[in-house]
Amino acid sequence: MQYQGKPEYFARELARLAAEGVRILGGCCGTTPAHIAALRAALDALPGQLPVAAAAPIPTAAKPEVETDDAFLRKLNAGKKVIAIELDSPKDADLTGYLDGARRLQAAGADLLTIADCPIARARMDSSLVACRVHRELGLNVLPHMTCRDRNLNATKALLLGLYAEGVREVLAITGDPIPTAERDEVKNVYQFNSRKLAQYIVSLAGEGREMPSPLTVFGALNLNARNFDVELRRAQEKLQNGMSGFLTQPVLSAQAVVNLKKTRETLGEKAKILAGIMPVVSQRNAIFMENEVNGIHVDAEIIERFAGLDRVQGEELGLEVSVKAAQAAAPYADGFYLMTPFNRIALMERLIARLKDEGIAD
């Protein structure tokens, strides 16, 4: 390899730097003996004593940003039953109504807002951007979901750094629903990670000399309704080994889900934080759809039958009662509750939060 620049140009430019005070000059692998000889001659031709550049002050390393006060984690680690509530981001570019709903849920007593990452692989407003806006404007703790479906390593890292800079300190790492078969010619799955590897990568970004001064808290998903729950539980143990701190479960809508939740607590111990999923059923049609069409949800037949013939008001009342009883059954084995908002019914969720608090099920 050889520089294209002529020796005369090389010598003239470096001699100019020497006249400004640079004291150590030379060439890299592309220079030839002719370049160095020309430089020596140019330096010898400079008049008088070469000036010495004043030493520039060495900049001190900036101190890491002061840690944000994480009220959610503080309450969770204190052993109090927390309330996290999921509110799907908008399908369009208008966030006004969403922020109004988030304010109402915050005022009702929600400790954390979770935002799904394009559920069922349908595009919505980005969960992380929505989370940052909510956290910035409302001061409410947020838990953006982060799937492995849509981002490679570079995009994932860039997003995580942005979340940290915005004060977001919790993420939910999930594999994510695959792109529907009919759309795969236009939309591609990425899946560079699975949820366990994603969690491991997230926690690896923190520490001395790393990109983040302190680690993000990573949660994962736990399906209490899995047909082979022993396999699901083994995966949960692997997720903990890869850096996850706890789990948000699928809805508790069956007696078996409570049994599996109890088994989870006995197997994982108190170290793993578990938020039991509570999703109000609002009609028989809704219950039948969840039982037959939504992966990871099982609704007991008795619950489905109880909704027969009910109108909207009656359906919400029964859904509220079923949800409160599910939370009561789950409470001994959970560190809090993960409430899922059906059909954007904020008023229903306000009532559910109030009931959980009034009856001492949540703090």
PLM-predicted stretches and their roles:
Residues 1-363:
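Domain-level signal for soluble alpha/beta catalytic cores
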